[in-house]
Amino acid sequence: MEDFLRQLKDAAYDLSPLDIIPNHLYLTNVFFFENDTPDRDSPFMPHEALVASLYDSLQSFPILVGCLQPGVTTTKLVVDADNPNLPSWETHNVPDVHFGRVKTRGFHRESWPECINITDPLVHAEDGAASPKLLRVRVCRFAGNSGVAVVVRLAHCVFDAKGCTFFLNYWATCCRNRLKPGSTEAATPSPPILDRSVMYACLPPSVRPKPLGWLLLPLSLVLTTLVRVVMFFVGKKTSTGTSRALLFCVPRRTLDEVTKHDGQDKKSRLSDNDVVTALFTMAYAQMRQAASNGKMPRKVTAIVPCDFRHRLGVPQNFTGSCAVGLYVTAPLALLLQHITPSSLSEVAAISRRSVDEVDIKVIERFSKRAMLAIQLLGDKARDLYSLMVCQAFSNQSRLPFYDVDFGFGRPLFVSPMAYSKSLAVIVPPPPPSRDVYVYLTLEVEAMAHMLRNEGFMAMVKRVY
């Protein structure tokens, strides 16, 4: 830590509108590592190596020791070298839970120690601190030195999901290098790009942030006040309500069966993501139809993120939010059909067309919309998103969560935790499986209705 503090300098990072909208949330993941070495006396994944390598990695990620500094319609992350916002670190020893027991139960959430069972997605300061931690780490050590679970919570305003895995693998590489100093196996990870101006350089000038003109300031104040009033009366409908989260597996056979019914041009085949989007959107629409006593709009919209790094040439090591939310809209009559491979294929085709149509103009349009919302409402713009009655998705299925190796082997199981309700997070399965996992968070009653949907349940398996 001392080396990190010596080289730390004051800095300020202007967040983009894409960062500001989710700035009230953490990205949370838990990693399960098994100690399968014969020598059970040596500490597995020793505390000193994990902490020291974390601070090694922070030399390239000083943004993580910054403090949120909101303006009227802007937000910055400010690093104070004399008073950094250092990560929180907790260690829990669990003498009554053996890693083997959790593994035998397929990492079912009911088998987890209570210390890693986190449900709150919100960023907030604790213990009277002036600013919330941007990075929280919690380590659970199982009985008999049998394994370790590592929970990492990263503020969403700092990273998107891709930036999150970039940081996690960077930290893991630093740990491996520290364990074998001078080894030919030592790797030099590519440095991250934290400056949001790198993303703006790939976007049209019209999309780049502009200061709010003084003529618009009164309008901004009025709109912000109106949003506060609306949220006061309908707060129970927002992302902070009572929710339940389950992890589903969409088997490979289900995915393949749906794509067999695909009648589209073979140049644009349905992806796994299209099928998953269709499946959970149909189930969500059917749940909403039952809850609304038939009072539903003729069309239902799902929000599907589209990472535009590769489309616009934004460097892959850019770690800030770099995705726009596409609106995939399908007729209600189609969504209310019984869920079968054939009906799923029809809805999935709509998702595929929406993604295929993404180009610079689409990205520019959505970015401008986010920019205007932030200009006028600041971080209150997120409240408007929380009021949307639609299924939202986060596609993380291709991200290298299972490559995170601190020098003691890769994780046997990785799971997201603590997400907002009405969000379906698509994540990779444990290797070598080719299934797709989906972590779904809904209101308690809504989830109960989903579980009673026979068509939906025929297409999935519950992991927990």
Predicted regions and their residues:
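Short, compositionally biased low-complexity segments
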Residues: 18-28, 223-236, 317-327
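Divalent metal-binding acidic/histidine catalytic loops
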Residues: 311-318, 330
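Short acidic alpha-helical/loop segments enriched in Asp/Glu that coordinate divalent cations
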Residues: 290-302, 360-371
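Helical lid/core segments from catalytic subdomains that handle acyl or acyl-like groups
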Residues: 321-404
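Non-catalytic N-terminal regions of enzymes
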Residues: 1-210, 242, 256-263, 270-293, ...
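Flexible, P/S/T/G-rich "lid" or insertion loops adjacent to the active sites of thioester-utilizing
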Residues: 205-268
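Active-site rim elements
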Residues: 37, 41, 266, 334-341
